[in-house]
From Swiss-Prot:
Organism: Borreliella burgdorferi (strain ATCC 35210 / DSM 4680 / CIP 102532 / B31) (Borrelia burgdorferi)
NCBIfam families referenced in this protein's UniProt entry, alphabetically: secE_bact
Family, per entry: Belongs to the SecE/SEC61-gamma family.
Domain of life where this protein originates: Bacteria
Gene that produces this protein: secE
GO biological process: intracellular protein transmembrane transport; protein secretion; protein targeting; protein transport by the Sec complex
Listed GO MF terms: protein transmembrane transporter activity
Protein task: Essential subunit of the Sec protein translocation channel SecYEG. Clamps together the 2 halves of SecY. May contact the channel plug during translocation.
Protein name: Protein translocase subunit SecE
Membrane topology: Single-pass membrane protein
Length: 56
């Protein structure tokens, strides 16, 4: 178990971590994408609701 933890720490030191600006930029992109997709799906859901209530 201790070897696993030691090896994990050594591997984490080799990782190239992203800069703060990259994290913030990617976070903004994810936020806008999620917002756009949720609005789009909300509109599609509402239109399908209207079609179903009109047909039945």
């Amino acid at each position: 178990m201790f070897r696993f933890i030691k090896d994990s720490i050594l591997e984490l030191k080799k990782v190239t971590w992203p800069k703060y600006n990259e994290v913030v930029g990617n976070g903004k992109q994810v936020f806008w994408l999620v917002l756009f997709v949720s609005i789009f799906l909300g509109i599609v859901d509402y239109l399908m609701f209207l079609v179903v209530t009109y047909v039945f």
